[in-house]
Curated annotation (Swiss-Prot):
Keyword RNA-binding: no
Domain of life: Archaea
SUPFAM superfamilies registered for this protein in UniProt: Carbamate kinase-like (SSF53633)
GO CC terms: cytoplasm
GO molecular function, a single term: UMP kinase activity
Name of the protein: Uridylate kinase
Quaternary structure annotation from Swiss-Prot or TrEMBL: Homohexamer.
HAMAP family according to UniProt: PyrH_A (MF_01220_A)
Catalyzed reactions per annotation: UMP + ATP = UDP + ADP
Gene3D superfamilies linked: Acetylglutamate kinase-like (3.40.1160.10)
The species this protein was found in: Methanobrevibacter smithii (strain ATCC 35061 / DSM 861 / OCM 144 / PS)
Amino acid sequence: MKIVVAIGGSILLKEYDCKKFQEYSEILKSLASEHEIFVVVGGGKPAREYIGVVRELGAGEAQCDDIGIEVTRINAKLLLSALGDAAYQKVPHNFQEALEYSATGKIIVMGGTEPAHSTDAVSAILAEYIHADKLINLTSVDGMYDKDPNKYEDAKLIKEITASEMIEFISGKDTKAGTYEFFDMTAIQMIKRSSLETVIANGYDSENLIKAINGEEVGTKVISK
């Protein structure tokens, strides 16, 4: 299968060390023996902190986005370092480059691409662009909830949801740079338009990636309706 994996920066950089990079590199290398793997890495806390600084300096949202994109590309380079020869050692800056680099048969790792697109959106657009079979989004919670699980103890995990229902749920949410708490609208629209099989799961347990690819019950499954 051709698979796009989105990994939140907060997953890889929670402790600001190399452990998660090493952990994921081993799993990705194993998966690459059977699948064509593309990875999109988020910015996480470092991106939010830098964006906060530049916003205080009076920068507009487009400039804030640019800062965030640069951080995602640094994170991508860190994962490339962990992957070594198993990955193409250059970060694509756009979808065409990602497709071209994939001709090497190696794992492709990228970050953001342009202002106003979160890495969730980038992963969904990339999946459509390369005609991926599956999109796996690894985040800091167990999947999609009916409300913020970090704020509400009674938040319930949604095991299955349609893309149309997600669009209704997300409508009106904040979309400032660095504030994406879940999928943004562009990502969901891409999933719906391309009928893309998507799973959202907790990335702190890297084994969830394997479960999602194997079709086991994990996280939230998004149905492209």
